[in-house]
Amino acid sequence: MNREEFLRLAADGYNRIPLSFETLADFDTPLSIYLKLADAPNSYLLESVQGGEKWGRYSIIGLPCRTVLRVYDHQVRISIDGVETERFDCADPLAFVEEFKARYQVPTVPGLPRFDGGLVGYFGYDCVRYVEKRLATCPNPDPLGNPDILLMVSDAVVVFDNLAGKIHAIVLADPSEENAYERGQARLEELLERLRQPITPRRGLDLEAAQGREPAFRASFTREDYENAVGRIKDYILAGDCMQVVPSQRMSIEFKAAPIDLYRALRCFNPTPYMYFFNFGDFHVVGSSPEVLVRVEDGLVTVRPIAGTRPRGINEEADLALEQDLLSDAKEIAEHLMLIDLGRNDVGRVSDIGAVKVTEKMVIERYSNVMHIVSNVTGQLREGLSAMDALRAILPAGTLSGAPKIRAMEIIDELEPVKRGVYGGAVGYLAWNGNMDTAIAIRTAVIKNGELHVQAGGGIVADSVPALEWEETINKRRAMFRAVALAEQSVE
C-alpha cells in the first residue's frame, strides 16, 4: 500500500489501516518467529493440525499487544501499556465486547491473509452467566482469580504460510497520529530486521527420557467424591431432570519450566486442530484442543461436536479394529447423536430457517493418542446477527455441559467444588472483518504462580460406571502431564 492509498482509506473513515510486507521465511518456523518477535507479555502463537494428522497452512504469531480488555464478573477493565484507562460495571459484558471491537474500523485489504488482526484471547466458561438468568451467580470459589474474559487488541501480527514457506507481517497504523504511514513502515522495517537475527537455541528435549514419568498432582475431587458425584448425576438422569451431564475435575501440579517449553512438548505429543500459547503476563494459557466451539467465516456458522473415544492402536490394523469397535458401541453412538441434535439446535438459534445442515456425520478423526467420532454442523448466519451472537448462543459447548444444557449446568454448579474459569470456555479470535474462530478450552493448561492447572471431565449418562468415569478424567490429562515431564527437562 502506498501513501496515497493509505490517505484515501483514512479519508473514508477508517481509524486503523493495515500495512504489510511479505517475505520468504523458509529457514524459520512459527516457534522461532515467535521467539524473535513476540516473546513478551500479551503475545500469542496459534497453530493447527487438520484432522489430527496434517499441519494447517497458516500459523499466527501475535506481537505484544498494547491494549488489553479484561472482565471480572461484571466489571470491565481496559489497560493500555499496562496502565488501566477504563474501569466500570457492565450488565452485559458480551454486548460490550461487540461495542469495544467497533471502536476499531479496519478496512479489508486485498491480498492479505484471512486473519490480519482482531481481538484475541478467551471467553471463560462462566460467560454463560451473562446470558442465562438461572445461572447468573456461581456458588463456587475461584482460587485462580483470572478474568472471565481476556481479549488483547492484536494490532501487529505475523502470519506464517507453512505451505509456501513465507510470511505476511501486518501492523495497524492509526491515521490520526502524525506521520502515521511513515511510522507504520518503519515498524515493518524493524520487524524485518529482527527476523534476520538468529535466536539463542533452546535446550533440546529428550522424548525418551519423558516416557513413563508422571508428576504427582492434587485434584479438586477425591476419587470417592468424584464417583459419588457421578452417582448423583445418574440419580438426576433417572428422575428425568436431564439426559447427560459433563462434570470435570481440576488437577494441579508444581511447574518450574518455561511455559514455551510446555508448548513445544505439547505440539510434539498431541498436535490438534487448535494449538495455542498465550502469555498474559501474570499467567499463561497453553493448550492443544481438538474441538471447535464455533467458527463464523463469511456468514457460515460451524460447530463440530466430538464425542466417542478410543485409544490409538499399535498399527493400522489395530486402528481399524478400534474404529469399528467405537462405531458399533451403542452408548457412544447414542451420546454422539444427542450432541449432533444439540449442535443443530444451537446453530439454528442464529441461522436462517432451513439452512442448518449436518455436512459430516460420525466420521473418525485420529490424533496422536486417541481417535474420536466427529460430526460437522453448519448454518447460514441470519441477517442482522454477528459472530458474537453466535458465540452467545453456543457457549459453552454441549460436550462440556450436557443436555438439556441449562439444567446440566445447574447440576455442574451444584457438584463441582471450584469455578471452571478458562476450562470449557472459548479460546481464539474475533477478526476485524467479522469472522471468528474459537476452540473449546480443553486439554489446556493454566500456569500461574509456579503451578500448572489442567481440567478434564466426561459425559455421564444413565449407564455410566463411576469408577470408569474417574479413570477417564485421569486418562485425558495424560498427554498434558507427559508434556510437562518433557518440558521440565529444561530446568533439570
Curated annotation (Swiss-Prot):
Cofactor(s) recorded in Swiss-Prot or TrEMBL: Mg(2+)
Top-level division of the source organism's lineage: Bacteria
Binding, chorismate: G308, T309, Y423, R443, G457, G458, G459
Keywords: Amino-acid biosynthesis, Aromatic amino acid biosynthesis, Lyase, Magnesium, Metal-binding, Tryptophan biosynthesis
Disruption phenotype: Cells lacking this gene do not grow without tryptophan (auxotrophs). About 10% decrease in pyocyanine production; double trpE-phnA disruption requires anthranilate or L-tryptophan for growth on minimal medium and does not make pyocyanine.
A GO MF label: metal ion binding
Keyword Cell division attached: no
The keyword Metal-binding is assigned to this record: yes
Cited function: Part of a heterotetrameric complex that catalyzes the two-step biosynthesis of anthranilate, an intermediate in the biosynthesis of L-tryptophan. In the first step, the glutamine-binding beta subunit (TrpG) of anthranilate synthase (AS) provides the glutamine amidotransferase activity which generates ammonia as a substrate that, along with chorismate, is used in the second step, catalyzed by the large alpha subunit of AS (TrpE) to produce anthranilate. In the absence of TrpG, TrpE can synthesize anthranilate directly from chorismate and high concentrations of ammonia.
Protein's name in the database: Anthranilate synthase component 1
Gene of this entry: trpE
